């Protein structure tokens, strides 16, 4: 499996080990010089490659096991909330690794009772939250929501670790990239219209998420990328539900974007503290908010012609209705998903996920640059 990676990414690898030459912008990392042998992913529906099925994901988006999901690349539904690949898929491809198997479909053990050799596992779950499910139950907010949280994903990871032999565990932390996809947007979404304030959600979410990251770091994780929240005010769902006078300079929902921006500031502050506390680890922040807005500002630069409408859905003005979402009988699909940012009202098209992957991998919207993480890793080889 091959895919293009950015010239900057290729250059970083070349400098680090002095074994690469720039062949073209479509270069791939040779198997013998993979910077990472494994990737472990966490997150929500923006990263989930199959831990959810139809009827199990976010309320109103329960048709991911049916066409037209998966139409662009896989030609069939693969339980990804998109027409094709996600950002994590492009990350795996860029490192010449297979797509990550979802944890719930993984055959974890062999005849000896130890874990089968894989190139990583995806623990992300669609609709998941950062805050424990019990919090939402206590506040009568658990109707039609996914019960899994980041702590569920951590528990799955720890259960997976139990199947590993000693050498496998050592190799896992030495040779693995931990990709923490966007998670926490659902915490805000599930409390909309309730008496629970966004400040409360932010404080609980950031503190819980920080504990999650520290648990991984205490286990020995050395290479970690953490995505911030995207510009949620630019999503079709937000555009269709918010008041028309609630708009920012880009035409997105200002209140929603401000909420994501404030959350990301708090997250970045915590990451700075973690870098000081764990100096031997490399923790990269992926600025999803600004990366997304960069595409909104200059869509034609990325081959995009439709910034706000959903490719798959029904109804004006955004081709989206909450009760007739993608996969229902009434929904239709646009002719070319590659020209759209949004796939089904909330989730993105393969084309947009690829743009995000490229921006993160080439370091345009990562701090420190993703290439710095690669150089540090390859200097240990």
From Swiss-Prot:
GO terms for cellular component: extracellular region. Belongs to the 'GDSL' lipolytic enzyme family. Glycans are attached at residues 112, 140, 258. One of its GO terms (biological process) is fatty acid metabolic process. The keyword Protease does not apply. GO terms for molecular function: acetylesterase activity. Keywords: Glycoprotein, Hydrolase, Lipid degradation, Lipid metabolism, Secreted, Signal. It comes from the Eukaryota. The active site is at residues 45, 344, 347. Residues 1-26 form the signal peptide. Gene3D superfamilies: SGNH hydrolase. The keyword Cell inner membrane does not apply. Its EC number is 3.1.1.-. It is found in: Secreted. SUPFAM superfamilies: SGNH hydrolase (SSF52266). This is GDSL esterase/lipase At3g48460. CDD domains: SGNH_plant_lipase_like. The lineage of its organism: Eukaryota, Viridiplantae, Streptophyta, Embryophyta, Tracheophyta.
